Amino acid sequence: MSLLTEVETYVLSIVPSGPLKAEIAQRLEDVFAGKNTDLEALMEWLKTRPILSPLTKGILGFVFTLTVPSERGLQRRRFVQNALNGNGDPNNMDKAVKLYRKLKREITFHGAKEIALSYSAGALASCMGLIYNRMGAVTTEVAFGLVCATCEQIADSQHRSHRQMVATTNPLIRHENRMVLASTTAKAMEQMAGSSEQAAEAMEVASQARQMVQAMRAIGTHPSSSAGLKDDLLENLQAYQKRMGVQMQRFK
């Protein structure tokens, strides 16, 4: 796996699923391929994205700044600085300075990532802030190692939280989660179907599914009524893809 592929993987792991994630993935690909060279416009675009947490925006802004060539005098962006200040906690800043001193002696991506993984996400974000604000300089490889370690820490806590929700025995939460997943799947089907003539059937199925979820929420249904909703939709989507000559593995 190449270095940039690894960075893209880690960064995307902390972005919530949805159309915005696909858009961010495309921007990262363009940036890493050297196709997007307007850092100013890229940062403005990032700043106005909804849904993303300030820290996720800060990490993405840091990655874009590391990768896109820019004039030396280009202003640092406030939204990135604020996100990478470790919540203003002096404890985080002390640890960030110690980590920075270690990273300065490191030259490899994996070495930097290994060192960084023993620090908290707050200290890692503060260390990124030091580098972003030009208070310290490390090689791009080392900076990317720091980014990936931070993303791994965040993704770990997100995964724990997700696992708790999936494993919950509360039928109401499970019911709502199944309806949310069905609704999201229907939305994705509509986007994939596009405007081809054969898409009408897939669009119809997706539309009916969304209406059904709305009705279930409006009238309040038994928690078990949502079982299998998403799987039914995915089967319809695969049948549609087969007719279109597209062979894909199951999405589950």
Swiss-Prot record:
Pfam families: Flu_M1, Flu_M1_C. A motif (Nuclear localization signal) lies at residues 101-105. It is a peripheral membrane protein. Its main location: virion. Gene3D superfamilies: 1.10.10.180, 1.20.91.10. Disulfide bonds: none annotated. It is found in: Virion membrane; Host nucleus. Plays critical roles in virus replication, from virus entry and uncoating to assembly and budding of the virus particle. M1 binding to ribonucleocapsids (RNPs) in nucleus seems to inhibit viral transcription. Interaction of viral NEP with M1-RNP is thought to promote nuclear export of the complex, which is targeted to the virion assembly site at the apical plasma membrane in polarized epithelial cells. Interactions with NA and HA may bring M1, a non-raft-associated protein, into lipid rafts. Forms a continuous shell on the inner side of the lipid bilayer in virion, where it binds the RNP. Homodimer and homomultimer. Interacts with NEP. Binds ribonucleocapsid by both interacting with genomic RNA and NP protein. May interact with HA and NA. Cannot bind NP without genomic RNA. Most abundant protein in virion. When expressed alone can form virus-like particles in transfected cells. This is Matrix protein 1. It comes from Influenza A virus (strain A/Swine/Colorado/1/1977 H3N2). The lineage of its organism: Viruses, Riboviria, Orthornavirae, Negarnaviricota, Polyploviricotina. The gene is M.
